[in-house]
UniProtKB/Swiss-Prot annotation:
One of the GO biological process terms: translation
InterPro entries noted in UniProt: Ribosomal_eL32, Ribosomal_eL32_arc, Ribosomal_eL32_sf
Protein name: Large ribosomal subunit protein eL32
Gene: rpl32e
Keywords: Ribonucleoprotein, Ribosomal protein
SMART domains xref list: Ribosomal_L32e
GO cellular component, one term: cytosolic large ribosomal subunit
Length: 152
């Protein structure tokens, strides 16, 4: 199934493109000495504290520190790249509260296959963009469609 596109106003389209450009320019923020010690390799950013710290003092050749200027435009912050607002769904009833023109759904990871198939079916009937239908769900829906066509 083709991906639905949200009809975005021109300023929002421009801001989504700008967000993509800013994302490409943003450096990877690393904790001090993460390249030196395996135990802190994947621990993420921690603010620097010492008076002699090169990152805090923004020395040339050292990793960039986290700063306000790397933030994305407020209007598109938290939006999916397609322009939809991403919403986590765990059952079919939650779809009734959402608008297919502005929301895209992501099915919760604890939802089993049977309920996931029901959610995807109902969401597509209502016109929602499902971000993570899953390969097994797609296969089950195709099989169901084929049996319905051959049965007629």
């Amino acid at each position: 199934m083709s991906r639905p596109r949200r009809e975005l106003p021109q300023p929002l389209k421009r801001l989504l493109k700008l967000r993509l450009l800013l994302k490409r320019k943003k450096p990877e923020f690393v904790r001090i000495d993460q390249w030196r010690y395996k135990r802190i390799e994947d621990s993420g950013w921690r603010n620097t504290r010492s008076i002699d710290n090169k990152i805090r003092r923004k020395w040339k050749g050292w990793p960039k520190p986290v700063e306000v200027g790397y933030r994305k435009p407020a209007a598109v912050r938290g939006l999916h790249p397609s322009g939809f607002v991403e919403v986590l769904v765990h059952n079919v009833e939650e779809l009734a509260k959402l608008d297919p023109k502005t929301h895209a759904i992501r099915i919760g990871r604890t939802v089993g296959l049977r309920k996931r198939i029901e959610i995807v079916k109902r969401a597509r009937e209502m016109g929602f963009y499902v971000l993570n239908p899953g390969k097994r769900v797609e296969e089950a829906l195709k099989k169901e469609l084929n049996t319905a066509q051959t049965g007629q």
